[in-house]
């Protein structure tokens, strides 16, 4: 069994914030994979189901970000799980939007949600770092993470969340390579190989056929050619 935790802040006010991308990811997984309805438990909300062969409990702590470890610790104790059975999905300033990285252990890098987890369960859990980019100035970080994703970012965000959901069974099974491939297939799909599409009426328009090298439109007839043609008509 695995416990997959999405980090964020509860309430409609924060729902679309960059800091809540962990919540967004587990909500997408629950919706796409037929999990049970969300219900209150462990100082948060849980949904239960399966990802491939793995039984999974999804958790959204309702303690606010800075106390996330309280909720996760309670869930772990009840479910009798070790830190290596926990996968935490969280926002990552040091990755560009659309990028994800998997990591086990290590420091919290100033992330308050991870700081709380370290205090309550140690650092041996797995984590999926979901890139949100950096505002460029550390003094702007607090406002940046608590601001909503821009409209221009929505399409890329949706592709990323779909990719995470597509690879969720691999994530739960510990198949990191297959998970990363699933994300990449959504975020950076293979470009057209150059073959003609089955239905050229859809997608990119066909390129016009190339003109032959001796296309008469390319070089209009000279005056002498026109006079010669006129002479031929009256012979």
From Swiss-Prot:
Cellular localisation: Cytoplasm
Active site as annotated: 19 (proton acceptor)
Enzyme type, top EC level: hydrolase
Keywords tagged on the record: Cytoplasm, Hydrolase, RNA-binding, tRNA-binding
GO terms for MF: peptidyl-tRNA hydrolase activity; tRNA binding
Family: Belongs to the PTH family.
Described function: Hydrolyzes ribosome-free peptidyl-tRNAs (with 1 or more amino acids incorporated), which drop off the ribosome during protein synthesis, or as a result of ribosome stalling. Catalyzes the release of premature peptidyl moieties from peptidyl-tRNA molecules trapped in stalled 50S ribosomal subunits, and thus maintains levels of free tRNAs and 50S ribosomes.
Name this polypeptide is given: Peptidyl-tRNA hydrolase
Organism: Paracoccus denitrificans (strain Pd 1222)
Gene (name only): pth
């Amino acid at each position: 069994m695995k416990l997959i935790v999405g980090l964020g802040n509860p309430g409609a006010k924060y729902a679309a914030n960059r800091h809540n991308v962990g919540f967004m990811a587990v909500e997408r997984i629950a919706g796409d994979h037929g999990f049970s309805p969300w219900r209150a438990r462990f100082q948060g909300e849980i949904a239960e189901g399966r990802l491939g062969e793995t039984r999974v409990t999804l958790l959204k702590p309702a303690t606010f970000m800075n106390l996330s470890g309280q909720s996760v610790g309670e869930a772990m104790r009840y479910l009798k799980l070790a830190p290596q059975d926990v996968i935490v999905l969280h926002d990552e300033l040091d990755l560009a939007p659309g990028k994800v990285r998997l990591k086990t252990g290590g420091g919290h890098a100033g992330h308050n949600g991870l700081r709380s987890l370290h205090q309550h369960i140690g650092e041996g859990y797995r984590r999926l770092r979901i890139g949100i980019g950096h505002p460029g100035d550390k003094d702007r970080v607090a406002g940046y993470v608590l601001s909503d994703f821009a409209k221009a970012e929505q399409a890329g965000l949706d592709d990323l969340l779909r990719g995470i959901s597509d690879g969720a069974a691999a994530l739960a099974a510990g198949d990191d390579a297959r998970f990363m491939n699933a994300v990449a297939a959504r975020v950076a799909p293979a470009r057209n190989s150059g073959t003609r599409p089955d239905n050229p009426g859809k997608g990119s328009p066909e390129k016009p056929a190339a003109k032959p090298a001796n296309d008469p439109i390319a070089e209009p007839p000279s005056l002498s050619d026109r006079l010669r043609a006129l002479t031929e008509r009256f012979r």
